[in-house]
């Protein structure tokens, strides 16, 4: 029952993800951060099989860091998204990863951006995107309330509406969510929306 969603506002991108580590009917953990920081101005929110998700996002993170180390300049968000898509496409015929990604970033020239990359290596630049069962409700909520000129406060309010909708509509809804923002000041954690604490 994973839920990952994000949107682009006026000079920033925001992503939110549930924090449940689930296998079949078992909940292993409810504080699993599924949003990885790629570098100072990029975030990757991922859903999918836990092993694939962790291994692939770490692989992308290390390769983005390696590129910056070798060349002295960071990859742009578009370049990082295209690299990620290429690696997924290469793996697709050999040992496919079951992982879906929303990549959010901020570049000086291009501004804030959000890229949708699914498990079969489809890549799209989007204003808003979502994966998982929660996407049915978060996408419809964002379709109704989203504006491209939203402030951070308005975007957080919209994210909270999406989380509320997911919690009220899904039979087995994820209880906790983490929210992260990337803008000209860098990538940072905004906060957690917790309804269940660890036992």
Swiss-Prot record:
Domain of life, source organism: Eukaryota
GO term, biological process aspect, one: proteasomal protein catabolic process
Residues recorded as bearing N-acetylmethionine in the entry: 1
Expression by tissue: Ubiquitous low levels, higher expression in siliques and flowers.
GO-annotated cellular components: cytoplasm; nucleus; proteasome core complex, beta-subunit complex
Alphabetical list of Gene3D superfamilies matching this protein: Glutamine Phosphoribosylpyrophosphate, subunit 1, domain 1 (3.60.20.10)
Keyword entries, A-Z: Acetylation, Cytoplasm, Nucleus, Proteasome
CDD domains noted in UniProt: proteasome_beta_type_2
Record localization: Cytoplasm; Nucleus
Task of the protein: Non-catalytic component of the proteasome, a multicatalytic proteinase complex which is characterized by its ability to cleave peptides with Arg, Phe, Tyr, Leu, and Glu adjacent to the leaving group at neutral or slightly basic pH. The proteasome has an ATP-dependent proteolytic activity.
Subunit structure: Component of the 20S core complex of the 26S proteasome. The 26S proteasome is composed of a core protease (CP), known as the 20S proteasome, capped at one or both ends by the 19S regulatory particle (RP/PA700). The 20S proteasome core is composed of 28 subunits that are arranged in four stacked rings, resulting in a barrel-shaped structure. The two end rings are each formed by seven alpha subunits, and the two central rings are each formed by seven beta subunits. The catalytic chamber with the active sites is on the inside of the barrel.
Similarity annotation: Belongs to the peptidase T1B family.
Protein name: Proteasome subunit beta type-2-B
Gene transcribed to yield this protein: PBD2
